[in-house]
């Protein structure tokens, strides 16, 4: 059972609709998703989902926001736990990879979306979307480390993109079903990130 999968009751219908919707899209595609079908799956009236989502696009946005919010919360926990430690970036990277490793359905849903926005600029925007918040945690902490290491401002953006590419690529490899690997991914992911997370001033 995946880490964040829960037993739902109608008192938490919004979250149940989101989780069921993610399952439907991953299994049969977005075109098969409807609020009426989700109501049936959740055992509630056809009108119940409209309390939370006026239309299908509202539900789709909420699904993405829901996943990124959970990831942001996990990254924030890691940041607080390892704050001021030299291996903070490694731990954050591991948290990112293992979050999707333990929640395949979230990963498959996110990569199927074409409306996810990630701000790769070195400047920090005031956007409040949860996908921006999750990435901003990685970006803020990486920037602190890079600046402390004497990395030039011009190079910081490139290094942040490279770091994100690393964890995103690792997540893809770990989740891909036809890749065989005998060792523990949880241990190996941290070792891999540590091996390439060497900050050199530019």
Regions found by a protein language model. Give the residues of each.
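Amphipathic alpha-helical linker/stalk segments
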Residues: 65-91, 108, 122, 128, ...
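Amphipathic alpha-helical segments used for helix-helix packing
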Residues: 102-122, 172-180
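Amphipathic C-terminal alpha-helical segment
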Residues: 102, 140, 144, 163-182, ...
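N-terminal intrinsically disordered/low-complexity leader segments
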Residues: 1-12
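Generic hydrophobic, amphipathic alpha-helix propensity
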Residues: 13-22, 38, 63-71, 75, ...
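Hydrophobic alpha-helical connector segments
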Residues: 62, 76-105, 153, 160-163
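Helix-turn-helix
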Residues: 16, 20, 24-58, 62
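Amphipathic alpha-helical packing segments from all-alpha helical-bundle domains
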Residues: 75-76, 121-147, 157-161, 187-198
């Amino acid at each position: 059972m995946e880490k964040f999968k829960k037993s739902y009751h109608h008192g938490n219908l919004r979250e149940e609709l989101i989780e069921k919707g993610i399952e439907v899209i991953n299994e049969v595609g977005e075109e098969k998703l409807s609020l009426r079908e989700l109501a049936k799956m959740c055992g509630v009236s056809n009108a119940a989902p409209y309390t939370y989502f006026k239309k299908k696009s509202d539900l789709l946005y909420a699904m993405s926001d829901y996943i990124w919010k959970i990831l942001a919360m996990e990254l924030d926990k890691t940041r607080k736990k390892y704050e001021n430690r030299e291996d903070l970036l490694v731990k954050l990277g591991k948290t990112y990879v293992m979050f999707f490793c333990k929640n395949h359905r979230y990963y498959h849903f996110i990569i199927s979306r074409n409306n996810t926005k990630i701000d790769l600029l070195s400047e920090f925007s005031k956007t409040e979307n949860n996908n921006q918040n999750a990435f901003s945690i990685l970006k803020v902490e990486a920037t602190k480390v890079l600046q402390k290491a004497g990395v030039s401002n011009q190079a910081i953006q490139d290094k942040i993109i490279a770091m994100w590419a690393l964890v995103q690529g690792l997540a893809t490899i770990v989740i891909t079903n036809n890749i065989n690997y005998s060792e523990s991914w949880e241990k190996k992911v941290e070792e891999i990130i540590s091996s390439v997370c060497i900050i050199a001033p530019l």
